[in-house]
């Protein structure tokens, strides 16, 4: 038995300079697990609640001392003496202790920090790398990265309505080569945007935020950078979008202010279909607002056979909502954000449900990140085959990529890089 003997939480800073929760879990053997939780800017209304202090005198109300106190008192008292290897039981203890549907009493930032730290401690105690602790001894695949190279929407101060324009290297034989491809494209994109007179400052997730005229110009810049780096768009590198459509859905219309467009659900589907015809787009995240289920159904019926349609705000890593989507034939993929649900066990259940239904599961960071690299181990351990963890700058993003490099090295020739096979939910790829 790997008994928990102490649980300690503290307030640290995330990549945006906002407070977040870090937790240490100590076992009787002397082993310790440490984990820190992320925070989002564009959030779904049904996400688990991160507990903030609301004290305007500290961090503009964004302090997390209440969540820290909850870990150091109630949560600590509830799990000290439990076996760290019993992840599901510990997570259920946290859920029951909170007692709310959305973890609003203790805070999902409190429960998740502890859930992750328990897993790290248990893996260390077992002498296993975290990805093996999550996934067992079977064959594993490296994830294809979604690299957010141009930021818009809530992640940047520009006129681009679409929140993320991403590249996905798919023709390479290894994750290492895919990462090199992405980095080379990123550096060429910097040169191209600079030459065109755009600023090369970066957004929350490390991508550039040029004040482009619209989505097509952004994608053309990316395609130019892909070619300049010596790769072929559509063969070596595919494109992906995160619309974050809930952010510009107003009174039943999709208001793309940067492009001067006001579109119905059908009109926005046409807009996305046109982009997919012009560019090698393989994935569109949150292509409709979270509450526009009729729009989602229309989008899925129209594009779901050839485009990965990822539900983020739509599903918020919640199995109850995902089950509704599967039953109604809405989307064909789920974005997995550990802090949307608040425990690892619930996160893993969402991945399992998606796979059983033939949906893909994309493991994702948040716009407010830390140096914690747990999601890299989750992506490999659960054989998710896709990861979304930002651009090729900012150490909070690079921490995940570097961990994936270490994992690939550790696995050697037993691991595969799936490339286009990662899109097992599509029939025409």
Swiss-Prot record:
Keyword entries, A-Z: Cytoplasm, Glycolysis, Lyase, Magnesium, Metal-binding, Secreted
Main location: cytoplasm
Residues bound to Mg(2+): 242, 285, 312
Enzyme class: lyase
List of residues binding (2R)-2-phosphoglycerate: 163, 337, 366-367, 388
Intracellular or extracellular location(s): Cytoplasm; Secreted; Cell surface
Pfam families, alphabetized: Enolase_C, Enolase_N
Pathway the protein acts in: Carbohydrate degradation; glycolysis; pyruvate from D-glyceraldehyde 3-phosphate: step 4/5
GO MF: magnesium ion binding; phosphopyruvate hydratase activity
CC annotations in GO: cell surface; extracellular region; phosphopyruvate hydratase complex
Enzyme Commission no: 4.2.1.11
Signal peptide: none
Note on cofactor: Binds a second Mg(2+) ion via substrate during catalysis.
InterPro entries: Enolase, Enolase-like_C_sf, Enolase-like_N, Enolase_C, Enolase_CS, Enolase_N
GO process terms (BP): glycolytic process
Highest taxon of the lineage: Bacteria
Active site (catalytic residues): 205, 337
Cofactors (names): Mg(2+)
UniProt record similarity statement: Belongs to the enolase family.
Physiological role: Catalyzes the reversible conversion of 2-phosphoglycerate (2-PG) into phosphoenolpyruvate (PEP). It is essential for the degradation of carbohydrates via glycolysis.
Protein name, as recorded: Enolase
Species per Swiss-Prot/TrEMBL record: Azoarcus sp. (strain BH72)
Organism placement in taxonomy: Bacteria, Pseudomonadati, Pseudomonadota, Betaproteobacteria, Rhodocyclales
């Amino acid at each position: 038995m790997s008994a928990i003997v102490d649980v300690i939480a503290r307030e640290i800073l995330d990549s945006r300079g906002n407070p977040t929760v870090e937790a240490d879990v100590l076992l009787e053997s002397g082993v310790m697990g440490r984990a820190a939780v992320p925070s989002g800017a564009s959030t779904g209304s049904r996400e688990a609640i991160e507990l903030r202090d609301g004290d305007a005198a500290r961090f503009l109300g964004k302090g997390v001392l209440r969540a820290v106190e909850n870990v150091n008192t109630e949560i600590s008292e509830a799990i000290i003496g439990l076996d760290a290897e019993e992840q599901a039981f510990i997570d259920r203890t946290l859920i029951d202790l909170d007692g709310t549907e959305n973890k609003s009493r203790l805070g999902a930032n409190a429960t998740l920090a502890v859930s992750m730290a328990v897993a790290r401690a248990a893996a260390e105690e077992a002498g296993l790398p975290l990805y093996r602790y999550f996934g067992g001894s079977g064959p594993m695949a490296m994830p294809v990265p979604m690299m957010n190279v141009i930021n818009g929407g809530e992640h940047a101060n520009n006129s681009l309505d679409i929140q993320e324009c991403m590249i996905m290297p798919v023709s390479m034989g290894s994750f290492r080569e895919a990462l090199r491809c992405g980095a080379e494209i990123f550096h060429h994109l910097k040169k191209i945007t600079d030459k065109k007179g755009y600023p090369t400052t970066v957004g929350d997730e490390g991508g550039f935020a040029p004040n482009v005229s619209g989505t097509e110009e952004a994608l053309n810049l990316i395609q130019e950078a892909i070619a300049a780096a010596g790769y072929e768009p559509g063969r070596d590198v595919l494109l992906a979008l995160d619309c974050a459509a809930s952010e510009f859905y107003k009174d039943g219309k999709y208001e793309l202010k940067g492009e001067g467009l006001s579109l119905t659900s059908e009109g926005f589907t046409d807009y996305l279909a046109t982009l997919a015809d012009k560019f090698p787009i393989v994935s569109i995240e949150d292509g409709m607002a979270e509450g526009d289920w009729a729009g989602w159904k229309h989008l899925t019926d129209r594009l779901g056979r050839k485009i990965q349609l990822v539900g983020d705000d739509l599903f918020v890593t919640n199995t109850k909502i995902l089950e509704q989507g599967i039953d109604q034939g809405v989307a064909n993929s789920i974005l997995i954000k550990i802090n949307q649900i608040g425990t690892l066990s619930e996160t893993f259940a969402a991945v399992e449900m998606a796979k059983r239904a033939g949906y893909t599961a994309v493991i994702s960071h948040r716009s407010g990140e830390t140096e914690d690299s747990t999601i890299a181990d989750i992506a490999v351990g659960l054989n998710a085959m896709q990861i979304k963890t930002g651009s090729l700058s900012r150490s909070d993003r690079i921490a995940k990529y570097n961990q994936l490099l270490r994992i690939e090295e550790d696995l050697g020739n037993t691991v595969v890089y799936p490339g286009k096979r990662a899109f097992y939910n599509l029939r025409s790829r």
